[in-house]
Amino acid sequence: MRAQPVISYEYPLNERIRTLLRLEDLYAKIAHFLGGDAPQDHHVALLTLFEVLEVAGRADLKVDLVQELERQRQILISFRHNPEISEQALSGALYEIEQASSSLLAMAGKIGQYLRENEWLMAIRSRASIPGGVCQFDLPSYHYWLNRDPEQRRGDLEGWLRPMIPIREGLTIVLRLLRASAQPERQLARGGTYQLTMGGRGAQMLQLRLAPAEAVVPEISANKYAINIRFMLSETVVRPRLAERDIPFEITFCSL
C-alpha cells in the first residue's frame, strides 16, 4: 500500500536552530540552481551564496556547530558495546561527525571572508540589493561572465562555495540528529486550534505533518512555556481564515 502524502512544517524554538534551518534551505537552493546550465540558474545560485554569507556571518556558527557535534560524539561513544546497537552503524556515525568537526576546525578566520575580499563579487552583491540593479549596462563584466560556457561558470561557483562546505556538512548532521530525536504524536486540533503547555519539554524544534487534502496551513506561535497552533484555510487571494473544523495532524517535539 502506498504511503499517504503529507506536508511537513518545521518551526524552530531558538535562534540557533532557526539559523541552521535557513542555511539548510539556502544550500539546497544553491545545489539546485548550480545543476542548471542557463545563465539565470547561475545568477540565482550566486545571489543565494550571498544570502548564505549574510546568514552565516550573523553568529558564531562554527563554534556552535563544533560544540554540538562534540556533544553528540560523546553521546554516541556512550552507546558502544550496547548489544542493541550496530557497532558498524555507530562507527560510521562517529567517523562522519569527526570528519565534519575536523573540517570546521580547519576553517580559518571569519566565515566567508574570502568572498568579502573579492571586489568583483562584492560589486555584484551591492548592485543586487537594488531592484533591477544587475542589468548588463550596470555590470558589463558580470554580463560577460554570465555568457561564458556553463562549465566555466559552474567551476567558478563551486570554487566560491567550496570553503563553506564544512558549514553545510556540520549543520546537515545536526539537523538530521535533531529530526530523528523523537517520534511523532497524533493530535487533533478542535475547531482548528491546538494549545499545549510545554510542561518542561526541552524541545528545540516542532515538526508538524499534515495531509495535503486538509487544505490548511499552520500558524505557529511558541516559546519554552507553551505552543499555540491555528490552522488557517489555504488562501492565495484573500486574507487566511481559521478553519473552524477539527484537523488531524502529527506533531514531533525534536530535541538534542
Curated annotation (Swiss-Prot):
Listed A to Z, the keywords are:
Cell cycle, Cell division, Cytoplasm, Septation
One of the record's GO cellular component terms: cytoplasm
What's an example Gene Ontology biological process for this entry? division septum assembly
List the subcellular locations.
Answer: Cytoplasm
Q: Which domain of life is it from?
A: Bacteria
Matching InterPro entries: ZapD, ZapD_C, ZapD_sf
Q: How does it assemble?
A: Interacts with FtsZ.
The family database entries (PANTHER family) matched by this protein are listed as: CELL DIVISION PROTEIN ZAPD
The record's annotation in NCBIfam families points to: PRK05287.1-4
Entry similarity comment: Belongs to the ZapD family.
Protein's recorded name: Cell division protein ZapD
Natural source organism: Aromatoleum aromaticum (strain DSM 19018 / LMG 30748 / EbN1)
Q: What broad taxonomic lineage does this protein's source fall under?
A: Bacteria, Pseudomonadati, Pseudomonadota, Betaproteobacteria, Rhodocyclales
- Gene name as annotated: zapD
